[in-house]
Amino acid sequence: MSYYGSYYGGLGYGCGGFGGLGYGYGCGCGSFRRLGSGCGYGGYGYGSGFGGYGYGSGFGGYGYGCYRPSYYGGYGFSGFY
């Protein structure tokens, strides 16, 4: 599930895997739900994958372009079901 860089996350550009603080651009999963652009699984940021706030979040939360806004609650544009 790593997207760009290190597998388990943390600070920096392109953190990859499940945990870590999730700061930075292109985080993979970000289980601690922090700020960042392009987070994979959770947290705030642009293009987050699974939940949390952000533009283009994948599974839930608030944001423009959520895939499944009703899955976790919240709202967004362009919901996929």
UniProtKB/Swiss-Prot annotation:
Belongs to the KRTAP type 19 family. It comes from the Eukaryota. It comes from Homo sapiens. PANTHER family: KERATIN-ASSOCIATED PROTEIN 19-3 (PTHR38140:SF9), KERATIN-ASSOCIATED PROTEIN 19-3-RELATED (PTHR38140). The keyword Amino-acid biosynthesis does not apply. GO terms for cellular component: cytosol; intermediate filament. Interacts with hair keratins. It holds the Pfam family KRTAP. The keyword Cell membrane does not apply. The gene is KRTAP19-3. In the hair cortex, hair keratin intermediate filaments are embedded in an interfilamentous matrix, consisting of hair keratin-associated proteins (KRTAP), which are essential for the formation of a rigid and resistant hair shaft through their extensive disulfide bond cross-linking with abundant cysteine residues of hair keratins. The matrix proteins include the high-sulfur and high-glycine-tyrosine keratins. InterPro entries: KRTAP_type8/19/20/21/22, KRTAP_type_19. This is Keratin-associated protein 19-3.
